[in-house]
Amino acid sequence: MSKLKVIPEKSLTNNSRIVGLLAQLEKINAEPSESDTARYVTSKILHLAQSQEKTRREMTAKGSTGMEILLSTLENTKDLQTTLNILSILVELVSAGGGRRVSFLVTKGGSQILLQLLMNASKESPPHEDLMVQIHSILAKIGPKDKKFGVKARINGALNITLNLVKQNLQNHRLVLPCLQLLRVYSANSVNSVSLGKNGVVELMFKIIGPFSKKNSSLIKVALDTLAALLKSKTNARRAVDRGYVQVLLTIYVDWHRHDNRHRNMLIRKGILQSLKSVTNIKLGRKAFIDANGMKILYNTSQECLAVRTLDPLVNTSSLIMRKCFPKNRLPLPTIKSSFHFQLPVIPVTGPVAQLYSLPPEVDDVVDESDDNDDIDVEAENETENEDDLDQNFKNDDIETDINKLKPQQEPGRTIEDLKMYEHLFPELVDDFQDYDLISKEPKPFVFEGKVRGPIVVPTAGEETSGNSGNLRKVVMKENISSKGDEGEKKSTFMDLAKEDIKDNDRTLQQQPGDQNRTISSVHGLNNDIVKALDRITLQNIPSQTAPGFTAEMKKDCSLPLTVLTCAKACPHMATCGNVLFEGRTVQLGKLCCTGVETEDDEDTESNSSVEQASVEVPDGPTLHDPDLYIEIVKNTKSVPEYSEVAYPDYFGHIPPPFKEPILERPYGVQRTKIAQDIERLIHQSDIIDRVVYDLDNPNYTIPEEGDILKFNSKFESGNLRKVIQIRKNEYDLILNSDINSNHYHQWFYFEVSGMRPGVAYRFNIINCEKSNSQFNYGMQPLMYSVQEALNARPWWIRMGTDICYYKNHFSRSSVAAGGQKGKSYYTITFTVNFPHKDDVCYFAYHYPYTYSTLQMHLQKLESAHNPQQIYFRKDVLCETLSGNSCPLVTITAMPESNYYEHICHFRNRPYVFLSARVHPGETNASWVMKGTLEYLMSNNPTAQSLRESYIFKIVPMLNPDGVINGNHRCSLSGEDLNRQWQSPSPDLHPTIYHAKGLLQYLAAVKRLPLVYCDYHGHSRKKNVFMYGCSIKETVWHTNDNATSCDVVEDTGYRTLPKILSHIAPAFCMSSCSFVVEKSKESTARVVVWREIGVQRSYTMESTLCGCDQGKYKGLQIGTRELEEMGAKFCVGLLRLKRLTSPLEYNLPSSLLDFENDLIESSCKVTSPTTYVLDEDEPRFLEEVDYSAESNDELDIELAENVGDYEPSAQEEVLSDSELSRTYLP
């Protein structure tokens, strides 16, 4: 026939035997003939199908009509043997061809024809056994590939046909086996499962699987798989519990465990566990499991299986069941609200903070009454879904699709009169520099030079200036902090002159429209390298006492702060020191061996000095750390708990260790071992000490005096530890404090431990974490700082801890804390530490701490050490925070060469770069990156000088001082994520955001839009450093609306800076960058500055908390050296960006340019389609233990108010403009 002649497959030829036989069979269908002929032809086809793969391939080849002919014959024939032959052919085709041939049969309508055949065959009395076996075998294979199969089977009445066959033929294993396989397929549909349950299928399965017998193991295996599928229905699970089948399953499991000595029946044992897993999805099932002593049974059997690796599936499934059935525990707290209270000046009308304040005092916010009442919803997928649907392309539902919302629309927001309050923060726009001591005393023609002739000193020390800045108060620092009187006096004069000119400068700005026009026309600036003379301040002028404290000279004086601090408590090794007055408060340096410094010998001193030189990459001068200055600054730092202690790491300072710290390899089985130890708490309750050893909520709490108990403390700046409970002799549960005016955001920790013994493995469990996953599961270690090591000239934070993992625990999270979601649990970070020194004082932190006082110290050192002839440096106060701390604003650029008009004009016309950091207090890495940026901008590197001559930098290095000071992770004292307040910041509740946005609005109003805005963040769920930007075209592209994206015309300049950084910064990863705009991020700084202010190059730069999986640092955990390097490389990238955007530069490297024809389609392949965490960021482990305690792999959408970043308006980790709790499957 003509259809058979047009065959595209090479192997299918017109003269092949199979083609002829199929043509003959088709003719029989068209022209009724004797059944003998049909039997003969189908038997021949069966013979070929059984013996030749070529025949099977030809019959299912694309374009072949063989399958249609067979199904047509099957549908029309009345002959039993012909039917059996065709069924046997179909069995051969689907058995050897894999999923493609099964799907091919489904697409040709095979399911419906076979179900109809089953219904017809069931009318025979008795039904033909061979026919039923064949039909059920084929349907069991093709059913999973037909997403409508469950509905089709139910409509055709196939469910009861199959079920009755099993009931009537329990001893006929040949017939029952395929029937059970098909029942398992039916049960994938929840409606079918309930229907079958009503007809006694659950009881029927238990007749087959018990009592214990090794006979017919294959039948038992299929019956158990079917039972597990059936018990996913809550109705069936309740029926099983009511009939006492949970005890039966446990008994059968123990029998198989005892008798299966050679582990040949592991699949049966796993099938029993799968059934238990299903039935314990309901509360009644969990109670029945506990009552039947299931916890102890599964614990003991799983421990006996640990020695055999092939039995790991049994151990893992047992662990899952036990975790699920473990009774939900209450966090041992009176309330989940922070231990510290700060009264807000204004209470928000709506939002989580408003809910917190409106909560009646009698309400228990720690747990819900119905916490364990709800069943775990794991009903089977409904019939409209199948596995293939999960393989669709990645689709981000949070992506913004409204083009009108995507288009940047500059909105003034505030009136020009209102914005004039920021004029005093921009003196560089109006200053004529008549009274400054510039390099050139005489005006001279403005010329371009290609080289910088004068070196610039490395800045190190500074003093914050005092005075009034409009209506914004500054912090007045003590003048005796200055390290060199002459320099301090000169600096004071310099800053005073600038302040005196503010009013005149304001008038100048209003009276010189010509200058403004010149400014507008020069937004991108000119590329000038002004001739410089030698610096007046040299490195030799900077006193060596400002070194960090571990050079040879500093070693001799290191005991100075210890001698002026008297010991308040006598102790042979450790002492509490105090007596430095804080204007009525006492500054305490915790516990320290007062003799430790004096016992250092000269050899150690020399080696320590060399170690420091080798490890600290500041070749041109001392570092920015000054312990005495730090103490003075802490006196003026205002905290809610009124901290009076200083943590030793902040006092001594940190230098990067001179060795690499690789990402930790996770040993196999760590997580299940930790989980087993947690389960032992329930099974062996007498072994649990359960003693409180630290408690912020109990002011009358006394520290236990026993010598073998660790002592804890976090009552210092940025500290966060609320409660510690000793569980076993060397194991402690730690509870973190909520952010102030909040009831969640537990992630950042920073605490002190003392009283340890060497050679003892101490286990620490932080038990109230909230994120669904963590880089602690992927090689990240906590940080530890040892005071003994610091005294031995090793003052650094190091990655520490073994047996680290992160998993869902049995402590219940109330709906109040989970944004209205019930039944959620907390997560545990667990790690084990062996301390090297006896009675040491050690500190642990989530990441490298960087306090507010540290920032103020660094800024003062930078200010006091810079050369005012070359570097224009101002440190103003942007505003005061809610608790009265100043928010610093830094301005850095190059001084004009002279006060000649052209030099001043060029100075004023430099484009702005606006940088900010640390809006999220727990992302301390952002501050280390900012430190690298600040140090580079103030360095004597010729590139840094070119950079200063190219831009004016406005920097807010810490947007959330209060959050940093008080140990918050995500919020300010307002209890809100400040990075979600940029659309409508409140001057009362979000002053730093309100005024930072005001600065940007002011620049927009005077037509001086920044060329770049970048907000530094940290990311807890991804590796490397990367950027998020904003692009209309890429956002539309990822909506899969290709037609719309083609219509969008957009300058691709937003890609230039990330691309430059991918070339020059070893930690930077372009493939992790994303330029999509998501709805949950519309109130972040990045999006608001892009959309409302109009800055095209508006970014968030995310730095990993863990390490890198690419580039130079692949396989290494990130440290402060790498973070500071990233900050410096960002500056270098800005200089290259300047050259690429400057009309005066030529010979540009083409590899760094973004051409318009660099299509989004190709670029999307090397960037991320979302800011959310993807599977490649958190891959599965070889150790397949689900992180959750439930049976379904939940895509944990943390905190309902958090979308995209766990926060009150979005959904992620309470990450950063970055991190998200939703894990989308690609």
From Swiss-Prot:
Species the sequence originates in: Homo sapiens
Active site: 1102
MF-aspect GO terms: metallocarboxypeptidase activity; tubulin binding; zinc ion binding
First and last residue of the signal peptide: none
Enzyme kind, highest EC tier: hydrolase
Gene that produces this protein: AGTPBP1
Boundaries of every Peptidase M14 domain copy: 848-1138
TM stretches of this protein: none
Catalyzed chemical reaction(s): (L-glutamyl)(n+1)-gamma-L-glutamyl-L-glutamyl-[protein] + H2O = (L-glutamyl)(n)-gamma-L-glutamyl-L-glutamyl-[protein] + L-glutamate; C-terminal L-alpha-aminoacyl-L-glutamyl-L-glutamyl-[tubulin] + H2O = C-terminal L-alpha-aminoacyl-L-glutamyl-[tubulin] + L-glutamate
Lineage: Eukaryota, Metazoa, Chordata, Craniata, Vertebrata
Sequence segments annotated as region (Disordered): 599-619, 1206-1226
Subcellular location per the Swiss-Prot or TrEMBL entry: Cytoplasm; Cytoplasm, Cytosol; Nucleus; Mitochondrion
Name the UniProt record assigns to this protein: Cytosolic carboxypeptidase 1
CDD domains recorded: M14_Nna1
UniProt KW keywords: Carboxypeptidase, Cytoplasm, Disease variant, Hydrolase, Metal-binding, Metalloprotease, Mitochondrion, Neurodegeneration, Nucleus, Phosphoprotein, Protease, Zinc
Result when mutating residue 990 to L: In CONDCA; decreased tubulin deglutamylation shown by in vitro functional expression of the homologous murine variant
